[in-house]
Amino acid sequence: MAAAPRGIWEQRRLGCGLGPLARLLILAQALRLLPAARAGLCPAPCACRLPLLDCSRRKLPAPSWRALSGPLPSDISSLDLSHNRLSNWNNTLESQTLQEVKMNYNELTEIPYFGEPTPNITLLSLVHNLIPEINAEAFELYSALESLDLSSNIISEIKTSSFPRMSLKYLNLSNNRISTLEAGCFDNLSDSLLVVKLNRNRISMIPPKVFKLPHLQFLELKRNRIKIVEGLTFQGLDSLRSLKMQRNGISKLKDGAFFGLNNMEELELEHNNLTGVNKGWLYGLRMLQQLYMSQNAIEKISPDAWEFCQRLSELDLSYNQLTRLDESAFVGLSLLERLNLGDNRVTHIADGVFRFLSNLQTLDLRNNDISWAIEDASEAFSGLKSLTKLILQGNRIKSVTQKAFIGLESLEYLDLNNNAIMSIQENAFSQTHLKGLVLNTSSLLCDCHLKWLLQWLVDNNFHHSVNVSCAHPEWLAGQSILNVDLKDFVCDDFLKPQIRTHPESTIALRGVNVTLTCTAVSSSDSPMSTIWRKDSEILYDVDIENFVRYRQQDGEALEYTSVLRLFSVNFTDEGKYQCIVTNHFGSNYSQKAKLTVNEMPSFLKTPMDLTIRTGAMARLECAAEGHPTPQISWQKDGGTDFPAARERRMHVMPEDDVFFIANVKIEDMGIYSCMAQNIAGGLSANASLTVLETPSFIRPLEDKTVTRGETAVLQCIAGGSPAPRLNWTKDDGPLLVTERHFFAAANQLLIIVDAGLEDAGKYTCLMSNTLGTERGHIYLNVISSPNCDSSQSSIGHEDDGWTTVGIVIIVVVCCVVGTSLIWVIVIYHMRRKNEDYSITNTEELNLPADIPSYLSSQGTLSEPQEGYSNSEAGSHQQLMPPANGYTHRGTDGGAGTRVICSDCYDNANIYSRTREYCPYTYIAEEDVLDQALSSLMVQMPKETFLSHPPQDAANLESLIPSAEREPAAFPTNHERMTENLPFSQRSSEIFQRPLWNMNRELGLLPFSQQPVLESPELTERDPNCSSPVTCRRLHDHAFDFSRTRIIQDGTEGT
């Protein structure tokens, strides 16, 4: 039998002097070790503590370890050879159960080999040795290895060949000299690796996608030399849950630095040099729950920083350089439960900054400078309805107002330690449910306002946990408030400053000077000082004047006045201003005065005059600046009634400062005004929109059939912009104008009095403007009597000519004489009145570049000149300049050129003695054609006029029988009008009309029936005539002029 282990014999020897119970325990231990002793497998240098074979700290020479070469106890699964100064290992072990080997704190330079147990080993710890590299061959025999700890060696790099393919789960390479990580160095471990520790190395850069470890859950890179983390650095770590990068000196995290870490819950970045928090580097961290960033240099939190990590439950930003918490600092963190902002430099907390933290339970604001949040009753903590713990120690708080903790209904623990609190208003803690209060101050002002605190501390059982004593009045100085009698809390004076004059809110224009005044009084001689704040931030380098004087108010009082002067205010000066008056006994805060800086609007873009075709898109630009930003609105012709708006053709693009009118129509033409308005004032800019339209027929052209001797009225109602010029031709040739031909409404009506057979034929109405020309045909059929057959005329019409039909109507001699007299009166009146008829003045018309002018060979409009001008059809117009100090008015209301001889004399001799005055004007926007025609009829030489009863002015439609006024298809030529109806059939219908319908069509006006003879001076020399032939003038006559009133009004309207 093998000898028993030395330990067992020693226990037996020591047990001889022990009691029965001790000997029994020793015997049990000996029996437990007996199987191992019997097997002879526990070597002398080691201790068997099943399942551990502890051979650590023996410090034996190498030959002493040969005893381990034999079989090991069967129950041994762990072997510890740490702290033995082993430099190599050449011994092979015999064990089927060995799984863990520790050889820490030795001097090994290579990976040891243990012989038979090596393939079964799952844990190998070689901490603090001298291994310089990782050799894949050494690990090929460790087929079952799951945990490898090589920390504190001298490994300098990890190569792609460092590890063989193995099922390693835990790898610790911390505290080495690793500076290089080759791409793909961990690829052979990608199927199993869960934990990697690379702390305390010399890694300065992490190559992108170096960690292709889809199962890795924990990665530590603490205490390296990483300064910049590039985007996509950690891509491939799909399962990572925790990343620790403390103490690296990281100064920049680029956008997408942690992209791909979709399952990460914990990120530790303490003790680095980060200066801000923004959503760029937080992108992709949607499952993040804990973020630790203390001990950095963070100065700012971007408004949308937490957009991609809204599951945060704990955020540590302590020991940074935050000076302000803006309103949007914590937007999106509705699940946050713990927030640590301690040991920063916070002096400004925006109103409502915590309103998004509805689930916050712990808020640590220790060692900042936010005394005003408690003293100014700003309700800075509103919205924290779940907060249970609030730490405010070390914030220089001097007073606690009644509204300081409004909104903290769930607050249970409040720490106000290390604040020299002097006053606490009554009911300051009434909104809370405090169970713990930490308060330590010896600066209390024990006056009547503090009497309530004593009883409140006792009632809530806080008198044992607080240390509060009085500093004033002097006879109570140093006494605990718990020992002061209630009758000693009196108010004999007002030591703390009291604000008497608050600064007032002001609205000022940009560039003016603004003055804000604040006045406080105190009964103490303690010096007072004032600081001004803008939006809760202290103002430096501003112009402040302070005045102090004594005044009598319930005794002597010190009055302190502070004046803040702001010169040439700008928009950056807008905000809420407040003065804070402080003396030895505390501070008082004035009301906040709002300064608003306005600026009158000024145009950046003004609309330009625009000329455009119908159907196109009109685009008017208008933009203005001012403060506040002016509102842009549009008017048309001084009103807001837009035809385009009613028809949903108007579009306003606020972002582009553009006003669109789609599918422009004639009714859109006018003056458009861009109005820029804000509370400081308004201004407007005008632009003229001119709409160009090709000539068109407003009413369809209709053929005419009249009885010989009747009056024929041919209508050519034209539309277009600018208003088109009209010319008439007959049978594709010039129209020979006689004393029976009259033109009205700018040649839109051709009136033939006492129609004869020679007047029958094809009349062409040719209208043209700057955009084009349009023509239409009217066929006039003159029949000899209403009962005559018109078949012959039909045949002549088909040959494109007119055949004289009918017989000469014998007119009574008296009617002929009457007709002659009326004709003389008409000529006399027209010459005397010398009505102003003009062509539309196109001098100032702005045309698109693609429209050449028909008045000038150079493509531009020609200046109107004195003399004669030829139209496109070959007719003539005599253009007269202003004379006798009078200016002729055009259709647009401005000055225009007077037309003496119009196109009615096509191809005629313009110097002929038979040349007659022919009115020429354009129709205005109102349709005055009906009125103009009725007025003009009084000038027609027809003896039957004298016997017609007086009547009012008739409309133009009265000249046309009702059957002819029916709307018809718009005819462009005569062939279209007569395509389906033979001329013989139509002529037969026309011939049925009685001869006396002429009077019914004319609709005559009343006039004087006294005969008027032509004066001998009617014919005289006209100096403006270019021909030596005498020109005929019309002079005034003595009969009733009321008959011409309608046509005069119509002329002025054009």
UniProtKB/Swiss-Prot annotation:
One of its GO terms (cellular component) is intracellular vesicle. Pfam families: I-set, Ig_3, LRR_8, LRRCT. Residues 442-493 form the LRRCT domain. Disulfide bonds join C518-C579, C622-C674, C716-C765. LRR repeats lie at residues 75-96, 97-118, 120-141, 144-165, 167-188, 192-213, 215-236, 239-260, 263-284, 287-308, 311-332, 335-356, 359-381, 386-407, 410-431. The modification Phosphotyrosine is found at Y905. GO terms for molecular function: signaling receptor binding. The chain crosses the membrane at residues 807-827. Keywords: Cell membrane, Cytoplasm, Disulfide bond, Glycoprotein, Immunoglobulin domain, Leucine-rich repeat, Membrane, Phosphoprotein, Repeat, Signal, Transmembrane, Transmembrane helix. InterPro entries: Cys-rich_flank_reg_C, Ig-like_dom, Ig-like_dom_sf, Ig-like_fold, Ig_I-set, Ig_sub, Ig_sub2, Leu-rich_rpt. It is a single-pass type I membrane protein. This is Leucine-rich repeats and immunoglobulin-like domains protein 2. It comes from Mus musculus.
